[in-house]
């Protein structure tokens, strides 16, 4: 098995954004403020999250970025002398650099947020036209990660055409077979989106970051627009491939946190299933958005939280925790700390995520926002085997079966039809399993297996 896995290790794409010290080669692991706090942030919120990442053992598992999302600056203006953005003194009385320093003292890294427009999504000053100044500022503050959004775009920087993103957070739909029949002003078939105003806006910030004497991981957030999957890896180390994971903000549960909904997890997974095979590689990772694990009493079930994390990890999307860690429930923390999925996600040898190999509920390659591909597999030398994820996308308890002869990584090896299998959730050795493994799953739950050597 190990020899076979070594043979299929791939070489990175020639035009990928390769950064010093391996920054961005693997998908990011960390915590981000937006899903849990939105604009209700300050130094205490950020430093509490950083301390919890250490205290809860998440740092030891590779979670390293503590990201300050939107709303960190003064909203009305830049510094009239330097043109720099000004940290909100009420929220960050000692400035962003002080927060960054304290995070670095914990052995962690710090991220900041801006937008490739005139204002951020919450209406704060953004970086279009100020790329050099802002990149210099972020480097001076010793920032390690930049999330760069796509709000506040002036008319003279808007794209001449509209790109189809078959996502209800972006467009009304419906999306038959993943198409957008009602799309206004579609681009000609030969249009090169890498030369679009969108690509140029994001490229300008990359150029500014590259002039700094500091490596800053660059995360693009344009929600799949402008065919970003075709050029994102040239400009950033990750790029959002869909609309926001929770676009309908405002609904809260009894614990006063936003309620995450399974429908968005399924919809984004469905979109990602048609992208990962072509676009996800070392140095460039499609981003399914920040995690919702642990968000909202009365929202997703524990089973749905498990499936959400399993799918994001298997797809090797960046894993940015988006919940309040000082009040997280143990069952949710256990999901975020799953060693099997984190090992696969951070495998330094294999240059690809898990791919869907069977849709299950639907015929293969069916575009269905409610019932995405249910069977995924990917090789992992770090796990000494193949990761297999089985999803029950139905609304009721149902059985799923992994048939070894259908798993691509287990084919053509002349190894017979029996393999050593481990339960990826519990770590339990399931023994030598012949031909297939069958499991009953709750609604929207996922089984995780590591299929090892022939036996």
From Swiss-Prot:
Q: Which UniProt keywords apply?
A: Disulfide bond, Glycoprotein, Glycosidase, Hydrolase, Secreted, Signal
In short, the EC number is 3.2.1.22
GO molecular function annotations of the record: alpha-galactosidase activity
> Which GO BP terms, alphabetically?
carbohydrate metabolic process
Q: Which reaction does it catalyse?
A: Hydrolysis of terminal, non-reducing alpha-D-galactose residues in alpha-D-galactosides, including galactose oligosaccharides, galactomannans and galactolipids
Subcellular location per UniProt equals:
Secreted
Which is an annotated Pfam family here?
Answer: Melibiase_C
What domain of life is recorded for the organism? Eukaryota
Give TM regions.
none
Gene Ontology CC entries for this record: extracellular region
Sugar-modified residues: 42, 177, 192, 395
Q: Which cysteines are joined by disulfide bonds?
A: 39-71, 121-151
Give the signal sequence positions: 1-16
InterPro entries on file = Aldolase_TIM, Glyco_hydro_27, Glyco_hydro_27/36_CS, Glyco_hydro_b, Glycoside_hydrolase_SF, Melibiase_C
Answer whether the UniProt record assigns the keyword NADP to this protein. no
Instruction: Give binding positions for substrate.
Output: 222-226
Question: What positions constitute the catalytic site?
Answer: 149, 244
Protein family: Belongs to the glycosyl hydrolase 27 family.
Q: Could you tell me what this protein does?
A: Hydrolyzes a variety of simple alpha-D-galactoside as well as more complex molecules such as oligosaccharides and polysaccharides.
- Name assigned to this protein: Probable alpha-galactosidase B
